[in-house]
């Protein structure tokens, strides 16, 4: 293999096999290898139309998604240079990279508030629709092995980031090395991707390697624990590439789940017993835990930061394989790795085939075909990165153990040298400190003091109120005298600042501490609160207008749409589950901060049942309609249908939207549908009617019984109008993924005069998140048969009219509401 174009061409061999599965949190979208190849070729043609030529730089700045993948391969197919940017990077960094790389085009995302405007660009969210009309063209000649394929900018500490030049040869070499190291991987496996694709570790191990072998990659929209665990349990995942911080998050999620059931002690006893058992018995012992990860999950691939012995032991004891590797972006990036059949705890494994490693004064130095040629237009940095005899200086400190495996001691730049000349490796102290009760997060840095450096701990407490001095004293009890922590600071935010791969930005922490005159045991308050910035960004408000006591609705103008955006943004930023039902008119900004800090469990939604859409219960509906519903309806309603021919071309689920005048709207509309659609359609009903504000016990019994009947015999599910909307939205997404259409009444209540009422904003959220066509429906005559307020129906004629399907998912929220209202009103006139 000489370049990534060979991987792209291999997509043709895998045809309809799933290449990418994207879980938006609402829907599940699949892209086959054949579809991905066509998207890439069309993207190349589109880039040609935009004036992008061979060797031109294209900035790729967005979250992991099918569109990101299509854009990447389109740039490769065009012969351009991919310039990936961390999705969470700020606008200034993106501008700096665009300027330094001389990018001529950008692919960016609407998920960010700020966008690049200095160069032509396209939004990732628009790519699918935009490429539909693009005619594929013959691809340009294949690139030479030494042509630049990617320009990857390092995260850096201070100053301008450096552009790492990676050629087609570099990437192809490392891809061959990685796949050769793990012959167990095959096209039958699915991989869960949790790290940003702009990070080379994820790109090589979790993106290029699986696609080159015909595997399936699963992306999730947010990294909250529930989304990750749902992907594990529903997607038949075999392996996941992760950094240690993500493994810690998953470990905490497992421990909390056991503790919530009163089984925390049992889990600890199982973990203690497991090391003495053979692998098969370990797997049997931890069957309850393994079920949470799916029946085929087997492998954690860890990299990007040192893996603690505690994390390795936890997952290994549970019967999972944990393979740790090591590398740098400059090396494409993988240099060493443990093997699936053999792991050495605390070591990062053995050099990949073709990788040479040596230690010079403790520094790890490497060379091989995967090592980059230099930094982009930075000759001084390039010369400083290589020795006179051509070895790349990694800047990492290491040693080789008795098995020949490499052990990484830490970054040379992070090494703390005390005034006594003692070398202190902060990673070793962090591992001890993180185990102490009262610590949520921590890092250890060197602070200038007495002609050397003080070993200084920065601690995020867990909310238990335990004094920091007590925490540090306990940690020091497990550390030898020469390396003990001699200073500490309380970090007042919920998390330490991190990169998108969850590494702590120690340089940022140190800069903040150096700015404080009272560094030692002071409380550190960040100059710009991350949570306040997030709220202000979502709501489009200046920072000084968002205060802890501000009411989100009354003071800040939080709408139903903005509430969903805010909850999603919080979950993405803080990697937690947040119940949108907990955010109401009386919720203050400080209340939400408390929810984040407490990481409260989200209550299970009420009445959302997927099993009522199964074949069995669709049969129940057929039976109920045949012997009860249709005969009863025909006693009062003479039903006729217009426009049914407009439904003939429907090839999948849709959203039927209708005016609402009577309790009989739903059966009249469903009986107007052909049977193939009728029993694959679920109806949204006002949740508050069934579950809220009972006047007495009899009304409670009646309403709850009515819901049970409607759910089982009519295919109804609850849709709240106040709070808790997102749970119902997720339910609608799952129904759509199972091929079920939806019937909703966007007015939200029955019209008492018969005139169409304004549609609620929730419809726009449904259309955009579900990405389904909208079929307008008008029902005339029921306001005379059973109007609002009537207790008994009269006889009358009813007409149901269907309009042309509308594709509105890529229009604005306001346009969706306007177009939908006009379509239904047009059928009523």
Predicted segments with their positions:
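Non-catalytic C-terminal accessory region of glycerolipid acyltransferases
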Residues: 468, 514, 648, 723-829
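Conserved pre-ATP/AMP-binding loop-to-beta segment of ANL
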Residues: 16-18, 135-153, 160, 184-190
């Amino acid at each position: 293999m000489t370049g990534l174009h060979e991987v792209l061409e291999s997509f043709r061999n895998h045809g309809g096999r799933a290449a990418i599965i994207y879980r938006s949190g609402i829907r599940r979208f699949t892209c086959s290898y054949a579809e991905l190849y066509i998207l890439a070729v069309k993207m190349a043609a589109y880039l040609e139309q935009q004036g992008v030529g061979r060797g031109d730089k294209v900035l790729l700045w967005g979250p992991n998604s099918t569109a990101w993948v299509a854009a990447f391969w389109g740039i490769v197919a065009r012969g351009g240079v991919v310039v990936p940017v961390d999705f969470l990077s700020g606008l200034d960094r993106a501008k700096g990279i665009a300027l330094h790389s001389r990018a001529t085009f950008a692919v960016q995302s609407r998920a960010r508030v700020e966008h690049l405007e200095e160069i032509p660009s396209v939004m990732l969210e628009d790519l699918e629709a935009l490429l539909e009309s693009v005619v594929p063209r013959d691809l340009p000649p294949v690139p030479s092995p030494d042509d630049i394929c990617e320009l990857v900018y390092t995260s850096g500490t201070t100053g301008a980031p450096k552009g790492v030049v990676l050629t087609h040869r570099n990437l192809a070499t490392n891809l061959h090395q990685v796949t050769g190291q793990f012959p167990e991987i095959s096209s039958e496996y699915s991989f869960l991707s949790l790290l940003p694709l702009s990070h080379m570790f994820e790109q090589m191990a979790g993106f290029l390697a699986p696609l080159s072998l015909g595997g399936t990659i699963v992306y999730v929209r947010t990294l909250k624990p529930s989304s990750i665990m749902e992907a594990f349990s529903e997607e038949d995942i075999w392996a996941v590439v992760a950094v240690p911080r993500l493994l810690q998050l998953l470990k905490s999620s497992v421990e909390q789940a056991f503790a919530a059931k009163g089984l925390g002690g049992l889990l600890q006893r199982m973990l203690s017993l497991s090391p003495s058992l053979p692998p098969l018995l370990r797997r049997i012992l931890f069957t309850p835990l393994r079920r949470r990860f799916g029946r085929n999950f087997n492998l954690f691939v860890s990299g990007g930061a040192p893996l603690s012995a505690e994390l390795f032991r936890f997952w290994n004891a549970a019967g999972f394989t944990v393979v740790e590797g090591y590398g740098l972006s400059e090396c494409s990036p993988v240099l060493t790795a443990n093997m699936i059949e053999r792991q050495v705890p605390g070591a990062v494994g053995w050099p990949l085939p073709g990788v040479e490693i040596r230690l010079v004064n403790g520094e790890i130095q490497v060379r091989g075909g995967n090592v980059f040629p230099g930094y982009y237009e930075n000759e001084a940095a390039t010369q400083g990165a290589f020795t006179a005899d051509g070895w790349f200086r990694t800047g990492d400190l290491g040693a080789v153990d008795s098995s020949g495996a490499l052990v990484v001691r830490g970054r040379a730049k992070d090494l703390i040298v005390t005034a006594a000349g003692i070398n202190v490796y902060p990673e070793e102290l962090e591992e001890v400190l993180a185990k102490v009760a009262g610590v949520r997060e921590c890092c250890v840095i060197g602070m200038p003091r007495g002609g050397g450096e003080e070993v200084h701990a920065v601690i995020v407490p867990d909310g238990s109120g335990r004094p920091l001095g007590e925490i540090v004293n306990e940690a020091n009890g497990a550390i030898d005298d020469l390396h003990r922590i001699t200073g500490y600071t309380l970090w007042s935010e919920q998390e330490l600042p991190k990169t998108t791969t969850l590494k702590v930005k120690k340089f940022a922490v140190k800069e903040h501490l150096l700015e404080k005159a009272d560094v030692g045991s002071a409380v550190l308050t960040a100059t710009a609160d991350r949570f306040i910035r997030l709220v202000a960004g979502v709501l489009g408000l200046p920072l000084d207008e968002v205060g802890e006591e501000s009411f989100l609705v009354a003071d800040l103008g939080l709408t139903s749409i903005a509430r969903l955006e805010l909850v999603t943004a919080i979950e993405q930023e803080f990697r937690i589950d947040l119940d949108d039902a907990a955010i109401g008119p009386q919720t203050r900004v400080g209340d939400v901060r408390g929810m984040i800090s407490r990481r409260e469990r989200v209550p299970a939604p009420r009445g959302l049942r997927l099993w009522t859409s199964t074949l069995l219960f669709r049969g129940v509906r057929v039976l109920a309609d045949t012997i009860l519903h249709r005969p009863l309806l025909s006693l009062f309603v003479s039903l006729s249908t217009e426009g049914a021919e407009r439904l003939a071309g429907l090839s999948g689920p849709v959203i039927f939207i209708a005016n609402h005048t009577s309790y009989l709207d739903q059966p009249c509309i469903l009986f107007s549908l052909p049977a193939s659609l009728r029993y694959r359609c679920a109806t949204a009903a006002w949740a508050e009617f069934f579950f809220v504000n009972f006047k007495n016990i009899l009304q409670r019994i009646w309403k709850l019984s009515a819901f049970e009947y409607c759910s089982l015999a009519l295919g109804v599910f609850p849709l709240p109008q106040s709070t808790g909307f997102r749970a119902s939205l997720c339910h609608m997404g799952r129904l759509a993924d199972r091929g079920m259409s939806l019937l909703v009444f966007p007015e939200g209540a029955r019209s008492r005069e018969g005139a169409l009422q304004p549609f609620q904003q929730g419809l726009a959220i449904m259309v955009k998140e579900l990405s389904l066509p909208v079929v307008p429906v008008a029902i005339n005559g029921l306001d005379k048969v059973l109007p609002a307020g009537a207790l008994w129906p009269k006889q009358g004629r009813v007409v149901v009219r269907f309009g042309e399907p509308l594709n509105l998912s890529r229009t604005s929220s306001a346009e969706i509401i306007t177009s939908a209202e006009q379509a239904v009103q047009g059928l009523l006139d």
